[in-house]
């Protein structure tokens, strides 16, 4: 079963949505971001600094199985995603992610050149870009982003 993030209009019609992919793909995306924030015990012991200036709490602290991000949270989420994109575009691809998704990458002929390109949605579009577009629409339409 996969995660679908979407925006509904006032009549409950789906305006736009993103098939994020399997729940475990979204979870590994968030786990990697968490590693880059260096909030784990090992990072504290080794005194590693976060590669992000933002704490990434909007993305990391929300359950992925239910609920929504309201418009204010979408504004914050957009800032987080912009920073994630900037950092990930300058990082090497993660071999464990490539291995996890090797069938998808092979099918679509994708060879990620950086960490940003390791994350695609079910339509083979870059996940972070699609989430940024969804944030923009939620803000523009003054609608929450729903987890389905």
Language-model-derived ranges and their functions:
Residues 1-133, 137-148:
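Acidic (Asp/Glu-rich) sequence patches and key acidic residues
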């Amino acid at each position: 079963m996969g995660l679908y993030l979407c925006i509904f209009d006032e009549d409950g019609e789906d305006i736009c949505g993103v098939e994020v992919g399997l729940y475990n793909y979204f979870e590994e995306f968030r786990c990697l971001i968490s590693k880059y924030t260096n909030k784990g015990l090992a990072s504290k012991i080794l005194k590693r600094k976060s590669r992000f200036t933002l704490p990434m709490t909007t993305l990391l602290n929300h359950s992925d199985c239910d609920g929504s991000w309201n418009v204010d949270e979408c504004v914050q989420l957009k800032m987080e995603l912009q920073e994630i994109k900037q950092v990930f575009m300058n990082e090497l691809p993660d071999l464990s992610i490539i291995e996890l998704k090797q069938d998808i990458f092979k099918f679509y002929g994708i060879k990620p050149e950086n960490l940003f390109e390791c994350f695609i949605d079910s339509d083979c579009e870059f996940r972070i870009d699609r989430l940024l577009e969804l944030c923009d629409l939620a803000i523009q339409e003054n609608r929450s982003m729903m987890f389905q």
